[in-house]
Amino acid sequence: AIAAARLGAARVAAIELDHDAIGNAEENVARNHAQDAVHVIEGDAGTLLPLLAPVRVILANIISSVLLDLSAGMLAALTPDGEAILSGMLATEREPLRHELECGGWRIGAERVEGDWWSCVLSPR
């Protein structure tokens, strides 16, 4: 969220499910002077994304099981020209995830495997 603000995003919603992480997230936003753009919201992304839609970009560091649970909601929340930039998925899960995402209506763009981790850029088909 902070990186998005530094790169010029005027409005960033940082969704955090873990109540204990909210204070740290807000401190990091303040420490990086990003509070005008970044708003930390406590809650479930599956519930909040439809309320925030339409969005141009979704950034998420997310494990594969949560990604699959949120996939349809993320797709519905994006503008037709939007992108989801994802990291935090195990490289060993790359192929089955690719298959599930493509079957779920996503086009997979840039990808990167670094050590044990896979990241990718998705867009609606």
Q: What are these model-derived regions, one by one?
A:
Residues 1-46:
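Conserved SAM/SAH cofactor-binding pocket of Class I
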Residues 25, 63, 101:
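Residue-level signal for inorganic ion chemistry
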Residues 46-57:
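A short acidic, Gly/Pro-enriched loop at the edge of an enzyme's catalytic core
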Residues 56-69, 88:
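A short SAM/SAH-binding and catalytic strip from SAM-dependent methyltransferases
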Residues 106-125:
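Core SAM-dependent methyltransferase catalytic element
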Residues 81-94:
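ADP-ribose/adenylate-binding Rossmann-like module
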Residues 22-23, 67, 94:
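Short alpha-helix immediately C-terminal to the canonical SAM-binding loop
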Residues 68-83:
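A short glycine-rich, Lys/Arg-flanked "PGG" loop and its adjoining helix->strand segment in the class I
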